[in-house]
């Protein structure tokens, strides 16, 4: 009924609902929250209300401080040159890949299950070829025909980056 009230295609409202649900899971997780930085257009809409729009994906940066096994010398900093940061990011990329596979994907699956949400399929992009950002797709069970809106795909895309700064420079 929200779609009718706002004059918006119902599948867009549905997708926005799922984006909010996924954001809720991500940022209520104590083990992740201190290390995540919500970025991009979705943050401008959902967190800061700077723009009014419905969202399709969630852009987050994960601080290298999430990985206790990394020494300070391994972590990129804002005061380093771009080439120095890129070299360090290439070295720690495997940590981000493992985090997506062994932390984020299982976390999403577990939280969805705890909420009683069924028929959700969580798909991790092929990490053997993945570069930054790393992508996790959360396919949700749509209430609407797929052909109702061809450009509204029934999944939420999380793009997790180690490249983006999580602290002011």
What are these regions (language model features)?
Residues 1-169:
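Compositionally biased terminal segments of proteins
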């Amino acid at each position: 009924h929200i779609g009718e009230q706002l004059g918006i295609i119902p599948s867009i409202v549905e997708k926005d609902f799922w984006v909010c649900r996924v954001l809720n899971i991500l940022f209520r997780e104590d083990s992740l929250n201190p290390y995540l930085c919500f970025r991009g257009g979705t943050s401008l809409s959902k967190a800061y209300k700077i723009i009014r729009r419905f969202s399709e994906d969630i852009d987050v940066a994960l601080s290298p401080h999430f990985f206790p096994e990394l020494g300070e010398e391994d972590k990129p900093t804002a005061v380093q040159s771009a080439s120095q940061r890129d070299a360090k990011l290439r070295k720690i990329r495997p940590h981000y890949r493992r985090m997506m596979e062994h932390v984020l994907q299982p976390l999403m699956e577990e939280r969805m299950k705890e909420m009683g949400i069924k028929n959700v399929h969580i798909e991790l992009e092929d990490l053997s070829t993945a570069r930054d950002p790393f992508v996790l797709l959360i396919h949700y069970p749509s209430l609407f025909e797929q052909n109702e809106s061809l450009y509204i795909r029934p999944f939420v895309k999380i793009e997790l980056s180690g490249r983006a700064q999580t602290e002011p420079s």
